[in-house]
Amino acid sequence: MFRFASDIRRDSEGLVRNPFCIGVGLALLAGPACAQKTERPEVKVGDRWQFVRYYSVASTTPNVTWEINSVSEAEISGTENGEPLRMTPDLNVVDSPERKQSNPKALSFPLEVGKSWRHATDWLFKPKGSSGSIVVDVEVVAYERIAVPAGEFEAFKLVSKGRVSGTSPINSQYDAVITTTYWYAPAPRAIVKSVTHNPYLGVSTVEMVAFQPGP
């Protein structure tokens, strides 16, 4: 069954009490003594997350499920709601049922407060058939506790600002700034919450509802 907040929190509290931060892998690195800097997580076959994505009305009912079925040095692959999902080793989504990107870099490990980077990527938004490019500046701005439907987690807070350009299927032009604030939590090895302000799609929120680690 899925592990909810109480289970993961008990694991992380036990780790904090150990001054040497001895654990069973990055899945438990939730304590402040260990997670002020965090390395790339060890994603495993069988890892499974449930998220809720909503726009105007908040919800806690999951509508997105990720499950990992293959992990290599070059790529992580699995399914999103039963359809193909491909990610980089840093957990950046390359291809999903909703969108495709050439060079996603929302996460760049190791993470620590103050780190920043810039990346450019081509994108395809599948539901509308629109495409274009975006140049994004990302900064890790804080390490704090965040509450989501799955519970409370110690997480790195990141802010990205991207200048997007592109065309729609009817050849109208996109030119705007998209801002996303998101929180990566080492314990469930995932972005547990993101809030995106997109002038064309409105405000969208994604929150983690549950996490089940692989065997």
Predicted regions and their residues:
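Acidic, serine/threonine-rich low-complexity disordered tracts
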Residues: 36-103, 119-215
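Hydrophobic helical h-region of N-terminal Sec-dependent signal peptides
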Residues: 24-28
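Bacterial N-terminal signal peptides that target proteins for export
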Residues: 4-22
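N-terminal signal peptide c-region/cleavage motif recognized by signal peptidases
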Residues: 30-32
